[in-house]
Amino acid sequence: TLLRLVAGINTPSEGKIHKPKSCKIGFLTQDIKIDSQLSVFEYLNQSNPELTHLRSELDRVNNELVQREDYESRAYFDLLDLLNDLNHSFNLHDGYSWEEKIATTLKGLGFSDEELNQRLNTFSGGWKMRAELAKILVNQPDIILLDEPTNHLDIISISWLENYLQKFEGCLL
């Protein structure tokens, strides 16, 4: 119940829970319900809306620049400025290391190279829980709420998770 209160899923019968509006919470529940046609890797790759938007905008601006021939125009330079701003923001959000971070996290939790490309809905509940845990970890929330996270992990994955969480700089419950 405490985890659900902190996550904002339940409301307290008495008192209040205060947290900054910008506070990101990652909550791993025991009842994972994922039925995605995406591969495990794609599921995680699309889990950060800000990066997905930035990646899309970078592609759009790059495509527009490739098609233009007015290299000396103000509009062309404005697009270059926008591209620079988008690249800067993408870099600040670790966009250039995002896919590597996903693969490293999934492998740390026991997924093989082949399984990264396997559709998520073909996995058992325990493996879906690992994918959901990986999604939380790669998105680096301010607060991580874990409800029995090691239930479906083997010893190697538990050890990897312990090492990861020891380095985590946010709040962990």
Kindly give the residue locations of the regions a language model identified:
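ABC ATP-binding cassette signature C-motif
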Residues: T1-L173
